[in-house]
Amino acid sequence: GEAPGKSYADPYFGGEGPERNSCIACGGCMVGCRYNAKNSLDKNYLYLAEKQGAQVFSETRVIDVVPLNGKADGEDGYEVTTVSSTSLLFRNKRRWRAKAVVFAGSSLGTQDLLFKLRDKKSLPNISAQLGRRVRTNAESLIGVRLPNVDNMDSGIAIGSGIYLDEKTHIEATRYPRGSDAMGLLVTAMIRGKTDWRRVFIWLYTLLRLLVRNPRQAIGSIIPFGLAKQTIILLCMQTLDGHIDMLYKRRWYWPFSKRMVSFGPKIPAHIPEASEFALKTARRLGGMAGSLITEVLFNIPATAHCMGGAGMGRSADDGVVDVQSRVFGYKNMLVC
């Protein structure tokens, strides 16, 4: 019953946080709330840290972390080197000294930095377990585009979900109006094969769709209007699957190393999810779609990447201990 967009005192931290507004159902929760209604990082952790005297340096990238005073284990602290993450001409290199450091650059960002620091011998004692057991939610990003609808972009970004079976969950989600760039990665959904035949099945599907329903066929490759016409279906499963990451040179770019995955592949095609999307499309008169990387290359996408710097009893089976302290170093955590 509250009025959309109305301001309220901080409801989360006993009044210590900033004012918030009630939701106006713009659908922008996942891409960034513009109306002060979401409990985002700048309104909780960072806001409260700054209130206690911490300084936040935005648009800054860490490129080196070296133990001070020749103490290899970091007992005396670390020198941290940073550059601007947005300037192409002026790097604005700066050096900082800290008694302790915390790596919190998400799964991929933290792994990438730790790989680089170990490789350049700044932190050579980082465990060989770095990059092991990187997990996703075994998910598939699919959807249904409805050409005769123009209001699918209004509402809460993630509004409902159902279980197809004991291991498969699907959420109905949305993007706000104008957030159509994702449409460049969307194409008509195909069934079945996960090998090289998928490309030909996809071409056949597009040609058949072009003959039977030219409007849907053209709509499947044009991103404009995607947000207002699409129910995005995020499928996740509770299956035990993971990949491992290495830091190496690729044959097509031998000039520098980068993270690459290896080991058993995570499935890109989830039959239960595809059938659900196709049935939904038939019921609503729309077209089921999936990401072109899944269709052409059998490469899944994920919104949830986790792990890579896992806990263990020692450096032989983990990167950090149960208190997130990095093995081999003092005053260093991964969070």
Q: Model-derived features: where do they sit?
A:
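FAD cofactor-binding and catalytic pocket of flavoenzymes
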Residues: A98, S127-S256, C305, D317, ...
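Charged, often glycine-rich, active-site loop that binds/positions anionic groups
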Residues: E2-G14, G70-A72, E79-T81, T302-G310
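Glycine-rich loop(s) and the adjacent beta-strand/alpha-helix scaffold that form part
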Residues: Y35-N39, K43, E50-K51, T60-G74, ...
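A glycine-rich dinucleotide-binding beta-alpha-beta segment and adjacent secondary-structure elements
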Residues: E2-P4, A25-C29, I63-V66, I231-L234, ...
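General beta-strand structural signal in soluble alpha/beta enzymes
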Residues: V56-S58, F103, V334-C335
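Conserved redox-cofactor binding core of oxidoreductases
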Residues: G1-E59, N298
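Hydrophobic alpha-helical scaffolding
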Residues: E19, G32-N39, F103-A104, G263-I270
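Short amphipathic alpha-helical segments and helix-helix/interface helices
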Residues: Y45-L46, G131, S274, L278
